Structures are given as structure tokens and as C-alpha cells.
Amino acid sequence: MLPFWIALQFLSSLPVRLPGMPRPEELGRSLLFYPLVGLLFGVLLWVLNAMLGGVPLLLHAALLLTAWVLLSGGLHLDGLADSADAWLGGFGDRERTLSIMKDPRSGPIAVVTLVLVLLLKFTALVALIEQQQGFALLLAPLIGRGALLGLFLCTPYVRAGGLGQALADHLPRVAGRQVLGLSVLACLLLGGYSGLWAVLLATVLFFWLRQVMMRRLGGTTGDTAGAVLELLETAVLLGVALF
């Protein structure tokens, strides 16, 4: 179970302590548990949603979104912000884009992107609460973190060394594809036709974002992986709320 705890420690702000420094093979296997961590997030958010019944609508949605951000520690939002800055400031140049991603400072485009994504998530949550479609809280985190597994399965990692390289090099690929299949099945069981719609929408957006990354970078980084997760979560919430 160590790979699960590695995944939970990396993807969440929950107080998880590991017995020591994980081996590269254990890091690679931790990717197999990313969808499960997403489902755990979804269950926690679904329970919180039920507990907030009777709370004024806007406050209800704001508390859900706050809990969502706190659960991940803002990790993927940071990747989204860095990617937004780099894509605009990189002017189509690969090395300049990668260099900007490493800059810890956030420019105006990063701030605007974060505001827009959080605003879209908030308004989608308002609509979903009104429509009593709480199952979307299970789907979005599951699909978002499943997408990270899918990304490492089909996309080169372009930064040599570090955690991302260990994940990419030691991911068990056959098991990874099986876990992705089980994740899709879980979405269908949890959401029915809405689950199928969410998976199809996320798949189309995933491959478009991957194509954009391949054209600019020739692969992915940790920051662009975080951006993919955030954008897919947002798309799933909006898709279920609108259709």
C-alpha cells in the first residue's frame, strides 16, 4: 500500500507520513493510485455537500470550493498559473516556455487565469447544487487525477531528473491502462449517461491539450500536468451543469 500513501501525500494536503524515501519503482507505481485518490477527494466533497444542506446557496458553493482547493493544497492551481504565464510569455519558443515555468513569480496572465477557472468552478457548483447533481463532485476529481495517469502513459516527460522523470520511467504501463479502464467504468457507474458525457468531454479536451503541449514542448511537465487536471475538472463540472 506504500504507493497509495505516496500518491495521497503528493496529491493532497492531508497529513500523510511516509516511512522513508520512496524508491523510484514505488514512485512509478504511485501513479496507479491517482484515480483512487481522486475518488477519495470526491467522496469527501460529496459528504461535505450533504452536510451543508440548508446553508445559503452561494455560501454552500463557496465552502465546497474552498475545501476542494485546501484538499490539494493549491498544487495544481500553481501548475495552471505557471503554464498560463509560460504559454503567453514563451512566444512559441520551447526553451523560453520551460524557463518561465520555473520562475516562482506569477504574472498578470497567471492571476487572470486562476480567477477565471475558480469563477467557473464556483458558478458550476452553484448550478449543480441547485440541480441536486452531487455526483459531479465524485466525477470531476476522479477524472482529473485519472487524466494525470493517462498523460504519463502517452506523453513524454521533458524535464530530465526529479520526481516527474521517476514517475514516467517507472510507471507500470499495462497496469496503468487497466486502471484507466476501471476509472472509466467507475465514472459510468457513478454518473450513468452524465458520467459517459463527462468522460467523452474530458477525453476530447485531454487530447487537444496534449496536442498543444506536444507542439510547444514535445511532451509534458509537472506544471502542464497540473494545468490539465484543473482544466478537465472545470470542464466536467461545467459539462454536467450545462447538459
Swiss-Prot record:
Organism: Pseudomonas fluorescens (strain ATCC BAA-477 / NRRL B-23932 / Pf-5)
GO biological process: cobalamin biosynthetic process
Pfam families tied to this protein: CobS
Location(s) in or outside the cell: Cell inner membrane
GO molecular function: adenosylcobinamide-GDP ribazoletransferase activity; cobalamin 5'-phosphate synthase activity
Protein topology in the membrane: Multi-pass membrane protein
Keyword Cytoplasm among UniProt keywords: no
Species lineage: Bacteria, Pseudomonadati, Pseudomonadota, Gammaproteobacteria, Pseudomonadales
Top-level taxon: Bacteria
This protein's name: Adenosylcobinamide-GDP ribazoletransferase
GO cellular component terms attached to this protein's record: plasma membrane
Pathway(s): Cofactor biosynthesis; adenosylcobalamin biosynthesis; adenosylcobalamin from cob(II)yrinate a,c-diamide: step 7/7
Cofactor: Mg(2+)
Enzyme Commission (EC) number: 2.7.8.26
Membrane-spanning intervals of the chain: 31-48, 61-81, 109-129, 134-154, 188-208
Main localization (coarse): membrane
Catalytic activity entry: alpha-ribazole + adenosylcob(III)inamide-GDP = adenosylcob(III)alamin + GMP + H(+); alpha-ribazole 5'-phosphate + adenosylcob(III)inamide-GDP = adenosylcob(III)alamin 5'-phosphate + GMP + H(+)
Entries under HAMAP family matching the protein: CobS
InterPro entries: CobS
Residues forming coiled coils: none
Keyword annotations: Cell inner membrane, Cell membrane, Cobalamin biosynthesis, Magnesium, Membrane, Transferase, Transmembrane, Transmembrane helix
Family listed: Belongs to the CobS family.
Gene that specifies this protein: cobS
General function of this protein: Joins adenosylcobinamide-GDP and alpha-ribazole to generate adenosylcobalamin (Ado-cobalamin). Also synthesizes adenosylcobalamin 5'-phosphate from adenosylcobinamide-GDP and alpha-ribazole 5'-phosphate.
